[in-house]
Amino acid sequence: MKKLLGGPGTVCGLLLRIGQCASAAASIGVMVSAKEFSVHTAFCYLIASMGLQLLWSFGLACLDVYALRGKKDLQNPILVSLFVVGDWVTAMLSLAAACSSAGVVVLYEKDIKYCNTQSQYPCLRYEVAVALSFVTWIQIAVSSHVTFWILASV
């Protein structure tokens, strides 16, 4: 198997996973701090999706730390295929959650001008949480792309 930048068991892979954890946790934190987020199904789905992404990325970051400390090779076909499936599933869930939440934010901000009339409505927090979820998705997309190419090189 090829050693690609950002693959499992590499320093760049660990940094990608830490970035995914950090941006997913930040997205959850900002969304939970917003008032009345639980009224909207898309925002609840965003929190659930980012929570799953946080757990998945944290688990793989721990595995990367284990591999780096013990000089273990994580690039065998069975492990990499598990990484590919997990990354692609969480990537699709995260993209769907980010897009649906962005749709709700655009609806409130631009279409019905709800954010302008309701000054206590936390639209800025919703926007920041959605932006962070897209940052998370970009990092997941990079990870899933790299692991897919590692699996394809077998």
From Swiss-Prot:
Protein name, entry field: CASP-like protein 5B2
Side of membrane Cytoplasmic, spans: 1-10, 64-77, 151-154
Source taxon at top rank: Eukaryota
Subcellular location field: Cell membrane
rRNA-binding as UniProt keyword: no
Alphabetized PANTHER family for the sequence: CASP-LIKE PROTEIN 5B2, CASP-LIKE PROTEIN 5B3
Extracellular side: 32-42, 99-129
Keyword terms: Cell membrane, Membrane, Transmembrane, Transmembrane helix
Pfam families: CASP_dom
Membrane protein topology class: Multi-pass membrane protein
Chief location category: membrane
Tissues in which the protein is found: Expressed in the stele of the root.
InterPro entries: CASP_dom, CASPL-5
GO cellular component, one term: plasma membrane
Subunit structure: Homodimer and heterodimers.
Family of this protein: Belongs to the Casparian strip membrane proteins (CASP) family.
Membrane spanning residue stretches: 11-31, 43-63, 78-98, 130-150
